[in-house]
Amino acid sequence: MQDKKEMQDKMEEREALIDEVIEREWEQFQYVQNEGGRASCQDDHETFVIMRKSQFMNWTQELQESYRQEPIEAEAAHWNLLTEKYARMMESTAPERYAELADILPKRSKERIQMQEEMIAQQIRWEEDFAAKFPGVASTGRVIHTSEDTPWDTSIETYARGEISTYSDRTVGLLKKLYDQLAADHENLSEKTLRNMTALYGYESLEEAEKQQRARLER
């Protein structure tokens, strides 16, 4: 009975940690300046929470606690991590604008960039496998590859590169450890994230979401 209570307490503690991180991110997201004016997604709190929670639920507690410090440290330094993330994405989607911002972005070492690129390559493999297995659900999301980017459509690869580049070395090291463990166990992080997401949207399962989406596409 005690073990069950301790487990429940730990689950509630982790959920509270995730919620705290998401709300800090949401607060920073409100101050991101979009060149075309305020984006509609900046007013969609529910979707933001589901997207971020789906990702963070897969992280180890050590990784969650490491990343938890980053928006706090950024706020103390008057730095917006969400603005940095979208600025880094512009290296692919808006290179001229990115060139104007590049000098103010934190610099990353060659070793750090190499580690990031290894992780992104693994994520792309997961995304490609997921799209082959669940094409209906995959069709509702972003395109996969940076080569598919346009000024209006940012790929999963470019988004991942932008986000991972904002993390501290500490968090990147822990995330790399998670990626390596999942790959060794033949688990697909993209599929795990989408299972979380479809559950949070109220579907019985990812398979049920795929079935419904395929039916829509066939109409």
Predicted regions and their residues:
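C-terminal structured interaction module
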Residues: 154-196
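Short, structured motif recognition centered on aromatic/hydrophobic residues
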Residues: 56-72, 115-120, 164-167, 171-180
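Compositionally biased, intrinsically disordered low-complexity segments enriched
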Residues: 1-11
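Polar/charged low-complexity regulatory segments
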Residues: 9-43, 92-96, 100-150, 198-202, ...
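A cross-kingdom feature marking solvent-exposed beta-strand/loop segments within repeated
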Residues: 35-58, 65-70, 81-82, 148, ...
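Repeat-associated, polar segments at repeat-unit boundaries in modular proteins
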Residues: 64, 69-109, 179-209, 213
